[in-house]
Amino acid sequence: MSYVPIVIEQTSRGERAYDIYSRLLKERIIFVCSTVEDHMANLIVAQLLFLEAENPKKDVYMYINSPGGVVTAGLAIYDTMQYIKPKVATLCIGQACSMGSLLLCGGTQGMRYSLPHSRIMIHQPSGGYKGQATDIEIHAQETLKIKRLLNELYSKHTGQELKHIEKSMERDNFMSPEEAKKFGIIDNIISSRDVMTMSAK
């Protein structure tokens, strides 16, 4: 089990201990920092809903360092980002690959960022199945449906033509922040928090 740092704060009632992610949540920061899978997605969704309930008019900041993962888990996070009332600023720290890149570009328009040396990668969904031929065919058709859905979402958020998205996602497509900005996945490349704060206003 990986170690999670504990932060100690002094309050009027004495010391209060938080794990580092809970402390970041107090600042309305959600950290997507691992493979996207069901348990992690449920935690992210819960945090988004909590921050909306706490203050529906105050922005949420989602920091992303993820290699991607399960499509349905990623779509649960994505849909919740679109569902809640607060604006969601996204920031790539390290990498935003596969479903991580969809979450990055699914942030509020004008509030999608990357640090200077991050990497962004898009590609088509993959899947491996075994069993009866009919079941394999059903799963293959479902994968194609998901591929079309993801292409449409990237097209919506990047402003790129659907045909260009389809071509760009045929293979692993790695981008620098500059290339991701040109593609429409992010809006700005930032090197300090002050720049992020000013550009969000």
Swiss-Prot record:
Ranges in a coiled coil: none
Biological process annotations from GO: protein quality control for misfolded or incompletely synthesized proteins
Main location: cytoplasm
A GO MF term: ATPase binding
Catalytic activity, as annotated: Hydrolysis of proteins to small peptides in the presence of ATP and magnesium. alpha-casein is the usual test substrate. In the absence of ATP, only oligopeptides shorter than five residues are hydrolyzed (such as succinyl-Leu-Tyr-|-NHMec, and Leu-Tyr-Leu-|-Tyr-Trp, in which cleavage of the -Tyr-|-Leu- and -Tyr-|-Trp bonds also occurs)
PROSITE patterns per UniProt: CLP_PROTEASE_HIS, CLP_PROTEASE_SER
E.C. number: 3.4.21.92
Subcellular compartments: Cytoplasm
Gene3D superfamilies associated with the record: 2-enoyl-CoA Hydratase, Chain A, domain 1
Source taxon at top rank: Bacteria
Record keywords: Cytoplasm, Hydrolase, Protease, Serine protease
Cysteines joined through disulfide linkages: none
Classification via Pfam families: CLP_protease
Gene Ontology CC: cytoplasm; endopeptidase Clp complex
Annotated catalytic residues: 98 (nucleophile), 123
EC top class, as a word: hydrolase
PANTHER family according to UniProt: ATP-DEPENDENT CLP PROTEASE PROTEOLYTIC SUBUNIT (PTHR10381:SF70)
Family, similarity comment: Belongs to the peptidase S14 family.
Subunit structure: Fourteen ClpP subunits assemble into 2 heptameric rings which stack back to back to give a disk-like structure with a central cavity, resembling the structure of eukaryotic proteasomes.
Function: Cleaves peptides in various proteins in a process that requires ATP hydrolysis. Has a chymotrypsin-like activity. Plays a major role in the degradation of misfolded proteins.
Protein name (Swiss-Prot/TrEMBL): ATP-dependent Clp protease proteolytic subunit
